Amino acid sequence: MASPFSGALQLTDLDDFIAPSQDCIKPMKVDRRPGSGVAKIHIEDDGSYFQVSQDGGMKKLEKAKISLDDCLACSGCVTSAETVLITQQSHEELRKVLGANKTAAPDQQKLVVISVSPQSRASLAVRFQLNPTDTARKLTAFFKKIGAHYVFDTAFSRNFSLLESQREFVRRFRGQADPEQALPVLTSACPGWICYAEKTHGSTLLPHISTARSPQQVMGSLVKDFFAQQQHLTPDKVYHATVMPCYDKKLEASRPDFFSQEHQTRDVDCVITTGEVFKLLEEEGVSLSELEPAPLDSLCSSASAQEPTSHQGGGSGGYLEHVFRHAAQELFGIHVTEVTYRPLRNKDLQEVILEREGQVLLHFAAAYGFRNIQNLVQKLKRGRCPYHYVEVMACPAGCLNGGGQLKAPDMPGKELLQQVERLYGLVRTEAPEDAPGIQELYERWLQGAGSERAGRLLHTSYHAVEKAGSGLSIRW
């Protein structure tokens, strides 16, 4: 069975792209009560299970259920979440919510917001032979046609993610003598990589991982906190779906860290992939190219959008490039006009160096794909990692090549990726600190950069998953 998840989420220590385990081995906690004695299990014709005690009493046993949270917290494997995601995170779930909204009483309806990633937009632009701006406007028209109220671009939330990553690196670099300010800093925007780090090398890797939220989860904060307030709604009255190039983003949205106990709602309620958007279009009998374009939505008036924008530094968000430029200026007073990448063992492993008078001041790298990640981890464990900062992505070639992107049966994968990269690169870029609305939101929404509120809404934490101590494993 082929899996749509990233290599890092499917891995064992042997290969980059292996099929996931067909069996969940989540250990069962056995309830051993004193004096309970021996009991029998009776199976009814309908398949239900009853515990028969020694005195003849019968108690119906609960069905074993594996939730997505169970999967994330399970140390038995680093995969096997597909069956849960089919129901909890799918375009059918989005369709169900949109359908229910149309028939619900006004006070029971939810405000539906859909946030689209630039990578997904580029993939759809190639499929429908559109430019990025027309793709964005026609996607807005389509989602509103099926019941969404607002459609946003996660390039806006990526501004916050990049700025927080810049500040975090400078702080860690200046305080690197402190064991808690560990270098190198490893990016955290890729959930496949984060899942692997937490489950496989927690104590080694987690101190190095950036706490800055990914663009998806920053958008979750923006929509459920800032935008909900602007609409005079509580977060649970807003349904937020995202369109992503990656199946692993479904796991990220389901993390307990991004769930509000107060309002009983997630920052991102549903994640659908680029391919699932294409399925929605097919099911609706709509061709994106034939739709009339609609005006683009913006989160605040000062950031009104006439066209989509993006960032320099490649199709995975540009973390390396933005942090490198900022650090060079902030730490050493050097203005970097052009970032020069030097390929190493392969095209998915590159490095960038800042030198002055022969001295290396900054040493950054980009490591994509599990094999490069594995080599990076081994260097870290041996204390031989020369880098200050590493942009880590589980998918070879990064997010534009994510497992949720559209495939072209009549085009080689390499050629398709080149076309997606070309259209992604056509979008006008801007520095995150210069993006309209960003500084206003830092003051108006977050009470200033570096505030407690900014830390709470723009950062997160990661958790090493302990190996289960129970020897009893159940095949489901």
From Swiss-Prot:
Q: Which UniProt keywords apply?
A: 4Fe-4S, Acetylation, Iron, Iron-sulfur, Metal-binding
Keyword check for Iron, yes or no.
yes
The GO cellular component terms are: cytosolic [4Fe-4S] assembly targeting complex
Q: Which GO terms describe its molecular function?
A: 4 iron, 4 sulfur cluster binding; metal ion binding
Name positions with the PTM N-acetylalanine. 2
Q: Which Pfam families match?
A: Fe_hyd_lg_C, Fe_hyd_SSU
List this protein's GO terms for biological process. Answer: iron-sulfur cluster assembly
Q: Which amino acids does the record list as binding [4Fe-4S] cluster 1?
A: 24, 71, 74, 77
Q: Quick one: signal sequence residues?
A: none
Which positions does UniProt annotate for [4Fe-4S] cluster 2 binding?
190, 246, 395, 399
Q: Which InterPro entries match?
A: Cytosolic_Fe-S_CAF (IPR050340), Fe_hydrogenase (IPR009016), Fe_hydrogenase_lsu_C (IPR004108), Fe_hydrogenase_ssu (IPR003149)
The annotated subunit structure for this chain is:
External component of the CIA complex. In the CIA complex, interacts directly with CIAO1 and MMS19.
Please give the family membership noted in the entry: Belongs to the NARF family.
**Function, as annotated:** Component of the cytosolic iron-sulfur protein assembly (CIA) complex, a multiprotein complex that mediates the incorporation of iron-sulfur cluster into extramitochondrial Fe/S proteins. Seems to negatively regulate the level of HIF1A expression, although this effect could be indirect.
Name the record gives this protein: Cytosolic iron-sulfur assembly component 3
Q: Which organism is it from?
A: Bos taurus
